[in-house]
From Swiss-Prot:
Higher taxonomy: Bacteria, Bacillati, Cyanobacteriota, Cyanophyceae, Synechococcales
Keyword Iron part of the UniProt annotation: no
Entry's Gene Ontology cellular component terms: photosystem II reaction center; plasma membrane-derived thylakoid membrane
Subcellular localization, as worded in the UniProt entry: Cellular thylakoid membrane
Protein name, per record: Photosystem II reaction center protein I
Species name: Synechococcus sp. (strain WH7803)
Amino acid sequence: MLALKISVYSVVFFFLGIFVFGFLASDPSRTPSRKDLED
């Protein structure tokens, strides 16, 4: 039962991380101030 809970949480955090990463990756294109930090 513990393994099932761990696998479910890992999948949820995996998709959540992809969503957050995709949101932050598309953010600099809209905000010029974010591009200054990358340089």
